[in-house]
Design a protein with these regions (language model features):
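Long, contiguous binding/interaction regions
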Residues: 1-60, 64, 68-97
Length: 97
């Protein structure tokens, strides 16, 4: 049974917008892999200054996704997010919807 989750992540800032778009598309593909999840909304917050430096980065590109995900697919999704060089930080929480 799928549950509603909110995924917020910070993409490493890059002057080339295609790199950011590729990272967002990759995360969406991870969520939807094996039909374990479905992205319902993507909200791009844009470039923001970080509160503190992460991996020598002062700025990041914030993205928030709403998704319906089967809990059995969460470990693989979190593993991919942790191992991605483009994702600085992420937060995955159960939505209150």
């Amino acid at each position: 049974m799928k549950k509603a989750y909110e995924l917020t992540f910070i993409v490493r800032q890059d002057p080339n917008e295609d790199v950011i778009n590729d990272a967002v598309n990759q995360v969406q593909a991870w969520v939807e892999a094996g039909e374990l999840g479905q992205v319902t909304k993507i909200d791009r917050w844009g470039r923001r200054r970080l509160a503190y430096e992460i991996d020598k980065q002062r700025d990041g590109y914030y993205v928030q996704m709403d998704a319906e995900i089967d809990p059995s697919g969460l470990p693989e999704l979190e593993r991919n997010l942790k191992l991605s060089a483009q994702i600085l930080r992420y937060l995955l929480v159960l939505s209150e919807k």
